[in-house]
Design a protein with these regions (language model features):
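Phosphate-binding P-loop
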Residues: 2-10
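Short polybasic/polar patches that bind polyanions
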Residues: 3, 57, 124
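Phosphate-binding/switch region of NTP-binding enzymes
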Residues: 120-183
Length: 183
């Protein structure tokens, strides 16, 4: 509902939220529940394959169409998505990914901008939808330069009221649907 009916092929969505709120778990659930016959690649730079696999098993999300990759090199991630015939690529998180040609460390402003721009180009040319997980600052904004939010098609925030067991996904930018939608 927040995305206006689903993830659009070739689109790039950025989802941010506080540490530990469940961004990785939410997107693992999205990938595992996508249409049968569609191939998804979940690329993690934050956890080992064993950790992600364990969470997927705990949630009952094992799916033959879901591939896992522990990798921070953007070129390797993009090649793996192409090779897998993925229709959806999830990058967890943009702050851990780097493009080797830049020489800056992962999380640096130049890396964040270049990696996001390359993911956008990749999505638009391949038709593969990309969902990027982004960390948030203490103030609640997605960490990194504001240009990240301008480059992507949708910006979502995953949040919770203090003391509540419920989580909310809120769209603040969506080129394919309404904003200020909640789910």
């Amino acid at each position: 509902r927040v995305l206006g009916g689903g993830i659009v092929p070739g689109s790039v969505s950025l989802i941010g939220g506080d540490p530990g709120i469940g961004k990785s778990t939410l997107l693992l659930q999205v990938a595992a529940s996508a249409s049968p016959g569609r191939s998804m690649l979940y690329a993690t730079g934050e956890e080992s394959l064993g950790q992600v696999s364990m969470r997927a098993r705990r949630l009952g999300l094992e799916s033959a169409s879901l591939s896992l990759l522990a990798q921070t090199d953007l070129e390797v991630i993009l090649e793996a998505a192409q090779a897998a015939g993925a229709t959806l690529l999830i990058v967890d998180s943009i702050q851990t990914v780097q493009f080797a040609g830049l020489g800056a460390s992962a999380g640096a402003v130049t890396q964040l901008k270049e990696c996001t721009a390359q993911l956008v180009r990749f999505a638009k040319t391949s038709g593969i939808a990309v969902v990027i997980i982004g960390h948030v600052t203490k103030e609640g904004a997605i960490a990194g330069p504001r240009v990240l939010e301008h480059l992507v098609d949708a910006v979502l925030y995953f949040e919770s009221e203090a003391g509540s067991r419920f989580r909310i996904v809120r769209a603040v930018k969506n080129r394919f649907g309404a904003v200020n939608e909640l789910a």
